[in-house]
Structure formats: structure tokens, C-alpha cells
Amino acid sequence: MSIEGVFREGFVTTSLDAVINWTRTGSLWPMTFGLACCAVEMIHAGCARYDLDRFGVVFRPSPRQSDLMIVAGTLCNKMAPALRKVYDQMAEPRWVISMGSCANGGGYYHYSYSVVRGCDRIVPVDVYVPGCPPTAEALLYGIIQLQNKIKRTNTIAR
């Protein structure tokens, strides 16, 4: 949290934007949208070795309880409407991480007739995590980048 000044009396001054964004970065609740092998690495990131809980990232089973969607794997044309439906059920503000080459741009199956060439054609993506499959460290880095992006946003209209 960016603190503009600390007084001798023990007062802290900051902006309301900084406080709201600080609370949002400390409580990201992702919903997994695992479609292929990248989902296994996403599960690794949630286990004890990487421990996403220390960053305030707690996986939720329902889109109504989550504010972050991690799309991991090959998105087919048949699955695209379901992805959009789940995204629309999420509460505002909501963010999306695209994990892996297949979710980013179609990956190995880019030229297949049934593959969507990137999930950003269906939902707006905030952070892209490259790799085939990306490691758990790469996903962790992507989540930290998303937290930094959230800290920089203005939540209150001026």
C-alpha cells in the first residue's frame, strides 16, 4: 500500500483508491477453467510447495464466489459459449488470466477447425502466461503481475 505520509501522532494518510486496491489484491478468489494439461500445473500452484494462499488466492468452486478466472488449456468452439456464460456469472470487478499457449493463441492446435485461436476472442484477458505448459512459477508470476495491475487502477471516478 502506498502511504503518502506518516505523522508523529500515529496517523496514516493515504487515498481511498490505494486502500480499496490493496484489499482487492489481497483477496483474489480464482475459479479454475481447466481444459487441458495446463490445469495440472494450475493445481500444482495451489499445493503446498507454491502455496497461493499466502498471496490471498483461494480457489472457489462457483463463478458467483470468484473474481478471477484462470483459463488453462485448449478452448474449442463448443466450449466457448460456456466460457462466456461462466464469465458473465462472475461478480464485478472480475479479471481473467490466460494460461498456456493453447489459451493464449490456439497453441499446437492453432490451425484446427474446432479451436478458438485465443480465449481473448471470447472474454477480455488481463494477463497472459506463456508456456506449453507453463510452470507453476510462471502462473505465480502472472498472479503477482495481476496484483500489480490491480494496484495501479483507479476505482473511484474523479
Swiss-Prot record:
It is a peripheral membrane protein. It catalyses: a quinone + NADH + 5 H(+)(in) = a quinol + NAD(+) + 4 H(+)(out). GO terms for molecular function: 4 iron, 4 sulfur cluster binding; iron ion binding; NADH dehydrogenase (ubiquinone) activity; NADH:ubiquinone reductase (non-electrogenic) activity; quinone binding. It is found in: Cell inner membrane. Keywords: 4Fe-4S, Cell inner membrane, Cell membrane, Iron, Iron-sulfur, Membrane, Metal-binding, NAD, Quinone, Translocase, Transport, Ubiquinone. It comes from the Bacteria. GO terms for cellular component: plasma membrane; respiratory chain complex I. Its EC number is 7.1.1.-. NDH-1 is composed of 14 different subunits. Subunits NuoB, C, D, E, F, and G constitute the peripheral sector of the complex. Belongs to the complex I 20 kDa subunit family. NDH-1 shuttles electrons from NADH, via FMN and iron-sulfur (Fe-S) centers, to quinones in the respiratory chain. Couples the redox reaction to proton translocation (for every two electrons transferred, four hydrogen ions are translocated across the cytoplasmic membrane), and thus conserves the redox energy in a proton gradient. This is NADH-quinone oxidoreductase subunit B. It comes from Aromatoleum aromaticum (strain DSM 19018 / LMG 30748 / EbN1) (Azoarcus sp. (strain EbN1)).
